[in-house]
Amino acid sequence: MSEVVVSKNINVSANDAWNKLSSFRGIEEFSPIAKSETTGSGAGAKRTCYMPDGAAIYETLNRVDEDAMEFEYEINKGPFPITRYVSTVKVEAVDNSNTKITWGCEFDSAPEAEAEMSQLFEGFYNVIIDSLEGVLQN
């Protein structure tokens, strides 16, 4: 099992960040995902994310804790050389206009793919958090 965690402070309100992230919809607005489709809402919702090359990532929203501003999702199927991926996203208010986003995952992969996947996920989380800040500030 491998773990990747990225924590960053952004200059937006926690409520705005939480509302955008926890909907499990529209991730293409603030990520490298080209298009996404979500069915259902709350725990059990399914999302299909399409990469720019057309590859699809199939995800399930496992848990949403509104009070703690935290949710968990998993990748059920995708183009990555992993056998398990579970991610947790947490939103914490620093003050009225600053928020700490923590996005992390645990995944299983072949040893030769571990470093590449860790680097990929870390880069992806950094891009998402930075882009989220830009989208919410405009």
Language-model segments: residues:
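Hydrophobic-ligand binding "helix-grip"
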Residues: 29, 38, 52-98, 106-109, ...
